[in-house]
Amino acid sequence: MGPEGSNLKFSENGCDFWALENSYYRKGFFVDIGASDGITASNTYLLEKFYKWEGICIDPNPSTLKSMCGARDTIVSDLCVYNESGKILPFKYLGDQSEFYGWNLRSGIDGLVSKDMPVKMNDHKVFTITLTDLLELYNAPNKIDYISIDVEGSEIEVLTGLDFSKYDVKMFSIEYENEENRAKIDWIMSRNNYNRVDFDQQCTEDRYIKNG
């Protein structure tokens, strides 16, 4: 379901409307890490296009960068969010193979991305940046309403690169690859004063809201 009176649907699991409801439908600021082509299953497209949110879309996948730039009016970055800035890392992506629709949007850091892919993936090199450094680079506000993380295995690396004392983030949605990663994510979030809410056992995505 999309904006009132329409059948539009963007976010796969309704994270866009969840973010809207918990921000009382006011204009906000988002960070979309793993934004892919900017539209397909996007947690932030509706926020930007229909509710005038501002934000940053990040994805180092070279096969979706052009589409993301064309689809979004907000800041777009092809840097790779990681736990250390200034590294060059091997990166895997599937690319334009329509017979594997859905899979073709999957990509990630080599060694962290799932190996459960239908075909051999392409190789790429990416430049890394911590989430803190990225937010500083693009002059993000210190108060951020919503961060969406969908990075195919490197969720821990993204979170450990964020200075939680510097940036006051109200909400996170975080996809996880397995239960081991999920437990580590939950530990990081709980020690930084976040509660896990609205999780669905059928989905590999958890939502967090900051206490207070």
Stretches found by the model and what they are:
Residues M1-G212:
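Phosphate/nucleotide-binding beta-alpha loop and adjacent structural elements of enzyme active sites
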